[in-house]
Amino acid sequence: LMALDLPLPKQVFGHPWLLQGGDKMSKSKGNVIYADDMVRLFGVDATRYFVLHEMPFENDGVITWELVIERFNSDLANILGNLVNRTISMSNKYFDGVVRKTGVTAEVDEDLKAVVTGTRDKVQEKMDKLRVADAITAVFDLFRRCNKYIDETTPWVLAKDEADHDRLAEVLYNLTESITIGAGLLHSFLPETAEKIVNQLNTTSVSYTHLTLPTT
């Protein structure tokens, strides 16, 4: 770079080792897990998620087929997949897929909004420090909070009383907006998954710089 009179990098990210069963992967040991095999079995985004999530900034990462399957089932299928499916199913069942903001709010809504706002700031902070695993964990913590929000607001109970119709709409609106913002944050890590979420929710794709919840 100096010979070409090009600027030198101001920081270099040196990632840790990726271990298989506690040992460094080696062809001679026959313990290598190939990315192509993971992609064939789980897809590109799931492979991205595992590698990013399991390689913290300062520690060696550990990979086993058992752990890959566990992450796929627990994080991608259960936490994220079920959240999106539940939200879409309820929106379709109760409002034909079209939810709106009604202004019938509760304290739990403000807590969810605070988590959404805090997640965007946390992701930015972690990425500035090259802590990619922490950043993606923060996004999934938001999805966990959304799942908890469903349990707290019990939309299926609200649906039984016509008087709670507007409250039900507000709950599903908050969920849809929060998941959409979460998908926007996720896009840098799992682009295909994020786009699928936005398309399934039938919402407008959001840019990273505009990931905020409406105040009115």
Where are these regions (language model features)?
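Conserved, charged catalytic cores of large soluble enzymes
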Residues: V84-V123, N147-D164
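C-terminal, helix-dominated tail/subdomain
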Residues: K160-Y208
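Long, non-coiled-coil amphipathic alpha-helical linker/lever segments
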Residues: R120-A133
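Conserved small/polar residues in nucleotide/adenosyl-binding loops
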Residues: T209-T215
